């Protein structure tokens, strides 16, 4: 096969050399015209790349020094000859800790590289990831044209991994235009721009692989855009743009067992970035409002168990007293299907979107309750930051001692053994089970009837004090 290919190539070369000068010129012109008509990202990138910057950071962080055996601590005190100038042990953690290396904290300097995006040219605002500039004492920004500026911190939010810095004495900057990230669809083209490994501005392309990704860190507000555009170390804080050159996300994380790119990258949606940075500009921080609910994802099995005619949404398992949700009349067992007229795909998506909204924001939530669509209006209250035991999904309810409460008043939990499945799902002494899988439970016999059907998901309706909650298990 190789010989045939080479022969054909040689033949084509011979014929080409035999062409007249006029024919050769025509061929060259045709080739040039074809090249000019080929689609390219270059015109868009020429406009966008000046708004993407490289960020160099210097800072210090506290690290724990190793704890040495007690018998050796006397030899490594501040006055010890082992810790004096010229000693090979002087720079060791045992001498640097100041207390004989007994496990105390020590300040350690670091340098880091990342990327950022200019969102306000006049004021010099640059958005990046919190993990790029966290603990920074010196922040320097380099533009695509090589100019360098000092920058200062404006605000940061570890829970969303967004930070806002400001270029000092900005001149002739180019700001990026933000797109509506809610309009994104799986399959839309994406372009990632950043500074991987400190190489300088680099461009990669791909598509939107998925929307509404979460679960990287359960405590954070996550509603990621997933893309297969290559995102590597140093790309953090860089831009994810559409083919119009508009910002659709801030690159923030990759899923990579060995630290390299395998085509699974995550970006924070531009609408989320817009809400957070506007608060940082105004307050220097994010002042979150909260709904005051606990919940979980609505999947097909839970929908079947709860007899809900929906496949996607946020299932409300508990409403906190005196919260925004409680005042609006939201109840345990409701399914939140929309926020301000836009569909809600999961509890994580609801949490992330509400988590970017400031105190006092007015919302309209679409609910599915008893098979009917209900809309409620509410105003977000300030986050209480109270830690509430959430209801998780575990197997079984073994470990709970129960008895009938009066005549047909439900099943009361008399005791819960520590470490048992009943304790794990959140059952507590004094709880009263009044329903299971949307069926009323008046006594143990009725509860046993539901359990004997061996449902794939069990949703217990619990009366706890003055509140009604749901505990979910499968």
Swiss-Prot record:
Induction info? By heat shock. Transcriptionally up-regulated by sigma-E factor and the Cpx two-component signal transduction pathway.
Name the domain of life.
Bacteria
Could you state one GO cellular component term attached to this entry? periplasmic space
Upon deletion of the gene, what happens? Decreased induction of Cpx two-component regulatory system. Increased accumulation of periplasmic accessory protein CpxP, increased accumulation and toxicity of overexpressed, misfolded periplasmic proteins. Increased resistance to hydroxyurea, probably due to decreased degradation of misfolded proteins which eventually leads to decreased OH radical formation.
Compartment list: Cell inner membrane
This protein's membrane topology, according to the annotation, is:
Peripheral membrane protein
A GO BP entry: response to oxidative stress
Give, as one word, the top-level EC class: hydrolase
Q: Which residues form the active site?
A: 131 (charge relay system), 161 (charge relay system), 236 (charge relay system)
Keyword flag Signal: yes
Cross-referenced Gene3D superfamilies: 2.30.42.10, 2.40.10.120
Q: Which SUPFAM superfamilies match?
A: PDZ domain-like, Trypsin-like serine proteases
> Does the entry feature the keyword Protease, yes or no?
yes
Cysteine disulfide partners in this protein: 83-95
The residues that hold substrate are 58, 131, 161, 234-236, 252-256, 291-295
Residue spans crossing the bilayer = none
- List residues of the PDZ domain: 280-371, 377-466
For this UniProt record, give its keywords in alphabetical order, as a comma-separated list: Cell inner membrane, Cell membrane, Disulfide bond, Hydrolase, Membrane, Protease, Repeat, Serine protease, Signal, Stress response
- Show which residues constitute the signal peptide: 1-26
Report the function annotation for this chain. DegP acts as a chaperone at low temperatures but switches to a peptidase (heat shock protein) at higher temperatures. Degrades transiently denatured and unfolded or misfolded proteins which accumulate in the periplasm following heat shock or other stress conditions. DegP is efficient with Val-Xaa and Ile-Xaa peptide bonds, suggesting a preference for beta-branched side chain amino acids. Only unfolded proteins devoid of disulfide bonds appear capable of being cleaved, thereby preventing non-specific proteolysis of folded proteins.
Misc remark: DegP is indispensable for bacterial survival at temperatures above 42 degrees Celsius, however is also able to digest its natural substrates in a reducing environment at temperatures as low as 20 degrees Celsius.
According to the record's subunit comment, the protein's assembly and interactions are: DegP can reversibly switch between different oligomeric forms that represent inactive (6-mer) and active (12- and 24-mer) protease states. Substrate binding triggers the conversion of the resting DegP trimer and hexamer into catalytically active 12- and 24-mers. The conversion of 6-mer (DegP6) into 12-mer (DegP12) or 24-mer (DegP24) is crucial in regulating protease activity.
Please give the family membership noted in the entry.
Belongs to the peptidase S1C family.
What name goes with this protein? Periplasmic serine endoprotease DegP
Q: Which organism is it from?
A: Escherichia coli (strain K12)
């Amino acid at each position: 096969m190789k010989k045939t290919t080479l022969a054909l190539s040689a033949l084509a070369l011979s014929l080409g050399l035999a062409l007249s000068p006029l024919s050769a010129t025509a061929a060259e012109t045709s080739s040039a015209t074809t090249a000019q008509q080929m689609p390219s990202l270059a015109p868009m990138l020429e406009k966008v790349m000046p708004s993407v910057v490289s960020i160099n950071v210097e800072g210090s962080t506290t690290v724990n020094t190793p704890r040495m055996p007690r018998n050796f601590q006397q030899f490594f005190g501040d006055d010890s000859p082992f810790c004096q100038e010229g000693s090979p042990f002087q720079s060791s953690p045992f001498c640097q800790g100041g207390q004989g290396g007994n496990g105390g904290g020590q300040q350690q300097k670091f340098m880091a590289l990342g990327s950022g995006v200019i969102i306000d040219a006049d004021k010099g605002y640059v958005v990046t990831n919190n993990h790029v500039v966290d603990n920074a004492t010196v922040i320097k920004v380099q533009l695509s044209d090589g100019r360098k500026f000092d920058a200062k911190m404006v605000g940061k939010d570890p829970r969303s991994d967004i930070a806002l810095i400001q270029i000092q004495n900005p001149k002739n900057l180019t700001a990026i235009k933000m797109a509506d990230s809610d309009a994104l669809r799986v399959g839309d083209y994406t372009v990632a721009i950043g500074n991987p490994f400190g190489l300088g501005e680099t461009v990669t392309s791909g598509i939107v692989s998925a929307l509404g990704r979460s679960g990287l860190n359960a405590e954070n507000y996550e509603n990621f855009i997933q893309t297969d555009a290559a995102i590597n170390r140093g790309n953090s804080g860089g831009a994810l743009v559409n083919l119009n050159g508009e910002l659709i996300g801030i690159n923030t994380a990759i899923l990579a067992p060995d630290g390299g790119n395998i085509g699974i990258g995550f970006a924070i949606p531009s609408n989320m970035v817009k809400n957070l940075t506007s608060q940082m500009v105004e307050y220097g921080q994010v002042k979150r409002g909260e709904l005051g609910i606990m919940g979980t994802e609505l999947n097909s099995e839970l929908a079947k168990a709860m007899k809900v005619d929906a496949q996607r949404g946020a299932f409300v398992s508990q409403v906190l007293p005196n919260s925004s949700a409680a005042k609006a009349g939201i109840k345990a067992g409701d399914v939140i299907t929309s926020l301000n007229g836009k569909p809600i795909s999961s509890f994580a998506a609801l949490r992330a979107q509400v988590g970017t909204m400031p105190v006092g924001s007015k919302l309209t939530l679409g609910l599915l309750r008893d098979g009917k669509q209900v809309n409620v209006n509410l105003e977000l209250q300030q986050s209480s930051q109270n830690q509430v035991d959430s209801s998780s999904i575990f197997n079984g309810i073994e470990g709970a001692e129960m008895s009938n409460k009066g005549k047909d008043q439900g099943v009361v939990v008399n005791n819960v053994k520590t470490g048992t499945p009943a304790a794990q799902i959140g059952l507590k002494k004094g709880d009263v089970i009044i329903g299971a899988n949307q069926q009323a439970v008046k006594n143990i016999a009725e509860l046993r009837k539901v359990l004997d059907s061996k449902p794939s998901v069990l949703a217990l309706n619990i009366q706890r004090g003055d509140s009604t909650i749901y505990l979910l298990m499968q």
